[in-house]
From Swiss-Prot:
This is NADH-quinone oxidoreductase chain 3. Its EC number is 7.1.1.-. [4Fe-4S] cluster 2 binds at C158, C161, C164, C208. The gene is nqo3. It is a peripheral membrane protein. It is an enzyme of class 7 (translocase). [4Fe-4S] cluster 1 binds at H106, C110, C113, C119. Its main location: membrane. NDH-1 is composed of at least 14 different subunits, Nqo1 to Nqo14. The complex has a L-shaped structure, with the hydrophobic arm (subunits Nqo7, Nqo8, Nqo10 to Nqo14) embedded in the inner membrane and the hydrophilic peripheral arm (subunits Nqo1 to Nqo6, Nqo9) protruding into the bacterial cytoplasm. The hydrophilic domain contains all the redox centers.
């Protein structure tokens, strides 16, 4: 960092990095400067002029604080600190003038605008504007854009801050939005009126400081002050993005991102943001028992008694799905293993070694990507498996990092060196001599689940670890299941994996593992939230989904985080841990807790690092032995980004987005001859 420099802001003297902009220095001093175009995670545009400040001793006009750096300030007389003023008469008059210009063409839509109540323009007009307008001419009107089923546009409200253009170009990595024209004819538009193709496009809704870009599914459904806001964690991928769930009564109305620099910064994927309509459809709201080949509704005592009767004295296997919190995984493990059964969470066949956290989690943090100069991807397509992580890799690439890929070539929104598609390319990488100069540069190896889900998965992982060790790189295992690391941590694994767990089982207790095909032989008890693939067996117990119960999730870097309950399960649905606790009592093996707090105490006793909420534990490096690689090419873990779990498959909007994505990938029809 450069030597700090003293500056005086109003009556406060602070020391700041001279490379900081004036608006950043003001924030450090605790002084709020209004802004519309400036955003700390986007490039500087300097086109709204709302952030004007007075530079004492500088030009006799206000300066844009977002575009001027501290090092450009002139020192005061006799070496005194440079001085800027944010509340002088000059600044006040300038802000009033800028606000008047911004409101010239802005319609009086506040009563019918979805941004009302959380609108930057409303707030800043009240704080810095005047209560009248001198403008008497007709206002400009523009046609709205069709950006697709997610973002609704009202372009007459647009103030041309260009945040949406900069986000789509710089963060999302698409070039479909831009600004055309000059002066009053300038407008934000999409290229050839195309709909947006990014799976992160919903973030422009949050970035828009006015009501020009709003959520199409949420439109006209609620006002901000009607909503109950709950801070929670996303489970649509294994990144564990920080989110806020807004509810009205029993319904989830929308999902928004929360800032977390170490995980998702302030972005979320479109699946995270818009999957909430799947929480309302195809829900299991009562227990069912199969009799004479047909499912019939049952009471809870009846269903639990039938489940206990089926399990007593039988060989049991427990399967743990992708969205199961650590508490429920721990509870099922205790229940099934107490009855002499086996439990398995690696239901996709991933060859993750039990007990070796450096191999099934890695040693790197997500934020290590920011400083990496070299990033090697092995068998992963992060654009589909973790879109927000992919945006972070793109940010590192834009700063000069080099990216390599072993796997099928795909569009990752940034350039990369394609090393190869098969195991031979990985073997060549892991056995290559690496110079000391290269080892000294920060680097990271990222391994996808598709790379380790085949028979030689452990060999792939061993070679990836060898590459990381040889190059002094951090290792990050990119999971696709939000509950996988937590279940691995509690030891919900069987030697030999899924096939070994269900081999010879007479009863299978399926806890939300809808993607597993179970033969017709064993008696199957399904516990889950949606009427998906798994809910067609012998006994069905309706559980809560991630917004309806508090739970502990461990993300792909090994960071324990708490998801909080925002609403209640429909009908007779119950929290997953509570169902297992009640079933244990019915089996005569009552689990030693009667509350979630009691369960967590036992969980932390067994796995102490789970008590370190929002901390990433250091994992001791334990290299794997030598394994022989196969010959196959790498296949990615996710084929359809929008339909990866029961909640997403129940969402009509996710189905529409999936169909649109498939249509874009389909070959164009040949021209008629």
């Amino acid at each position: 960092m450069a030597d700090l420099r003293k500056i005086k802001i109003d009556d406060t003297i602070i020391e700041v990095d001279p490379n900081m902009t004036l608006i950043q220095a003001c924030e450090m001093a605790g002084i709020e400067v209004p802004r519309f175009c400036y955003h700390e995670r986007l490039s500087i545009a300097g086109n709204c002029r709302m952030c004007l400040v007075e530079v004492v001793g500088g030009p006799p006009k206000p300066a844009a604080s977002c575009a001027m750096q501290v090092k450009d300030l002139r020192p005061g007389p006799e070496g005194a600190p440079s001085e800027i003023r944010t509340n002088s008469p000059m600044v006040k008059k300038a802000r009033e003038g800028v606000m008047e210009f911004l409101l010239i063409n802005h319609p009086l839509d506040c009563p019918i605008c979805d941004q009302g109540g959380e609108c930057d323009l409303q707030d800043q007009a009240m704080a810095y504007g005047v209560d009248f307008s001198r403008y008497r001419e007709p206002k400009r009107a523009t046609e709205d854009l069709n950006l697709g089923p997610l973002v609704e546009t009202h372009m007459t409200r647009c103030i041309s801050c260009t945040r949406c253009v900069r986000f789509t170009t710089e963060v999302a990595g698409i070039t479909q939005m831009g600004q055309t024209g000059r002066g009053e004819d300038s407008e934000i538009t999409s290229y050839l009126n195309q709909t947006l193709e990014s799976n992160m496009q919903g973030n422009i809704i949050d970035l828009c400081p006015v009501g020009a870009l709003v959520s199409k599914p949420y439109a006209f459904t609620a006002r901000p002050w009607e909503l109950t806001k709950t801070e929670s964690i996303d489970v649509m991928d294994a990144l564990g993005s920080s989110i806020r769930i807004d509810t009205k009564g029993r319904e989830v109305m929308r999902i928004l991102p929360r800032n977390h620099d170490g995980v998702n910064e302030e972005w979320i994927s479109d699946k995270t943001r818009f999957v909430w309509d799947g929480l309302r459809r195809q829900r299991l709201d009562r227990p069912y028992i199969r009799e004479n080949g047909r499912l019939r509704p049952a009471s809870w005592p009846e269903a639990l008694e039938a489940a206990a009767r089926a399990m007593k004295g039988k060989k049991i296997a427990g399967l743990i799905g992708d969205l199961v919190p650590a508490e429920a995984a721990f509870s099922l493990k205790q229940l099934v293993e107490g009855l002499g059964g086996k439990v398995e969470c690696r239901v996709d066949g991933a060859r993750l070694p039990a007990g070796n956290r450096s191999a099934y989690v890695g040693t790197a943090r997500i934020e290590d990507i920011d400083d990496a100069e070299m990033i090697q991807l092995i068998g992963t397509n992060p654009r589909d498996e973790a879109p927000v992580l992919n945006a972070r890799i793109r940010k590192a690439w834009s700063k000069g990092a080099k990216v390599g890929l072993v796997g099928e070539p795909v569009d990752l929104t940034y350039d990369y060196a394609h090393v190869g598609t098969d195991r031979a390319a990985l073997e060549s990488l892991s056995s290559r001599e690496i110079s000391d100069e290269t080892k000294a540069r920060p680097s990271i190896v990222i391994v996808g689940q598709g790379a380790i889900a085949r028979r030689d998965g452990e060999a792939v992982l061993a070679h990836a670890m060898k590459l990381a060790e040889n190059s002094n790189s951090g290792l990050l295992i990119l999971h696709t299941a939000a509950g996988r690391v937590g279940a691995m941590d509690v030891g919900a694994v069987t030697e030999g994996g899924l096939l070994a767990a269900i081999d010879g089982a007479e009863v299978v207790y399926n806890l939300g593992a809808d993607e597993v095909d179970i033969d017709q032989g064993p008696f199957v008890i399904y516990q889950g939230s949606h009427g998906d693939r798994g809910a067609h067996r012998d006994i069905i117990l309706p559980g809560a989904c991630y917004t309806e119960e508090s739970g502990l999730f461990v993300n792909t870097e090994g960071r324990p985080q708490l998801a909080m309950r925002a609403n209640f399960a429909p009908g007779e649905g119950k929290e997953n841990w509570a169902i297992l606790r009640a079933l244990s009592a019915e089996l005569g093996a009552t689990q030693p807790w009667d509350s979630l707090a009691g369960l967590r105490r036992k969980l932390v006793e067994a796995v102490p690092h789970l008590a370190q909420i929002d901390q990433v534990p250091q994992n001791e490096w334990q290299p794997l032995g030598r394994f022989d690689l196969g010959q196959a090419s790498f296949r990615y873990a996710i084929r359809d980004f929008y339909l990866t779990n029961p909640i997403a498959r129940s969402s009509p909007l996710m189905g529409e987005l999936s169909a649109m994505a498939a249509a874009r990938k389909a070959p164009a029809p040949l021209a008629a001859e």
